Structure formats: structure tokens, C-alpha cells
Design a protein with these regions (language model features):
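Acidic, metal/ion-coordinating pockets
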Residues: 1-178
Length: 178
């Protein structure tokens, strides 16, 4: 969702369009603050996540427990990696502490981690660190889906990058003629 506003962030109205279309959760990353009006909206919208490893006091939340219509409870954790990205709190320690200690994870039927980052190696390292502790680790940020979807040795689903929701007749969602 972080590139929904013409490639730069997301607005409250776009966010609401997603939810009206049936989207359960919108994760973000390094473009989360590109549209200033999202700052006042993100605190009141638990379905819109910003990376969990932003410093304490940052508006919004990086994780939430969602209850599906079936009653199935899914914890979603949005984390931003650091290689070639802006320097945030250590994503590995942050997600490790969260998985170990947060009550949200103890009541979830599934835990899904969105690993927003540039480097495939960093996403893979996080996947292996969390293998057997979460249901899935799915990377985001590069706009290009990877063909490496698999189950890791201890049962965690993994994909280096899910790609983008956008126009494939484009350059990572932007005008190919620009």
C-alpha cells in the first residue's frame, strides 16, 4: 500500500478504498510518510501498519491481530530491513522480541511477517531466523515477485518478495515512457 498514491505513500482515501474492496490489512515501508495526511490517520486505523521497528512514539502501529470472518486470528507484523534502506531499529532484534513477548502472538492462529527491504539476502536471513516460529515471512519493496516460494525446514512459508499490485505494463508501477 505504500506506493498507492502515484508511487509515493498512501492517503487516507486510498486506504479506505482498499478496505471497502475487501483488503484486510495494508502494510507499508520506507514511503509510509510520503503523504503527510496519513500521519493523523494512521493512529486511528489499526488495519494500516507502518514498520514495527520505527522508534517508540512514532504514530501508528507495526503489528495487529486481525480476526477473519471465520474467527481465525492472524497476527501481521510489518518490519523494515536496513540494508540499503533508512536506518531504523534492528529489525532482527525487534521482531524477535515481539514474537517472544507480545500477547498478540500468543493468541494468534497464524503469524505473518512482512519483511520490507531491498536485499534478498537480508529477507532470507530473517526468514531462517523466524523459521518454525511464525507462519510466513513474505518480503516486499522491490515491486518484482520472486519465484522462490517455499516452506523452510521448520515449517515457515517464505517468499523473498511478493512483488506489487499494479500495472505490469510499466516500470515497477510507474509510467514506462518517463
Amino acid at each position: 500500500g505504500e506506493n498507492a498514491a502515484g508511487g509515493f505513500g498512501i492517503t487516507p482515501s486510498i486506504c479506505e478504498e482498499f478496505f471497502e474492496a475487501g483488503v484486510n490489512v495494508v502494510t507499508t515501508g520506507n514511503h509510509v510518510w510520503d503523504q503527510r495526511e496519513i500521519i493523523s490517520h494512521i493512529d486511528s486505523e489499526p488495519r494500516l501498519l507502518r514498520p514495527h521497528n520505527y522508534p517508540d512514539g512514532t504514530p501508528g502501529s507495526g503489528a495487529h491481530l486481525f480476526t477473519m470472518a471465520s474467527g481465525y486470528r492472524v497476527a501481521v507484523v510489518n518490519i523494515m530491513l536496513r540494508l540499503f534502506m533508512e536506518p531504523l531499529d534492528d529489525p532482527f532484534r525487534c521482531v524477535d522480541r515481539f514474537i517472544q513477548g507480545h500477547s498478540l502472538c500468543k493468541t494468534a492462529d497464524a503469524i505473518v511477517v512482512d519483511a520490507h527491504g531491498e536485499a534478498s539476502s537480508e529477507k532470507q536471513a530473517l526468514g531462517y531466523m523466524l523459521d518454525g516460529r511464525v507462519t510466513a515471512v513474505v518480503g516486499s519493496h522491490t515491486h518484482v515477485p520472486t519465484a522462490d516460494t517455499r516452506i523452510l525446514p521448520n515449517g515457515t512459508g517464505f517468499q523473498t518478495d511478493a512483488g506489487m499490485c499494479g500495472d505490469y505494463d510499466s516500470v515497477i508501477g510507474g509510467d514506462k515512457g518517463s
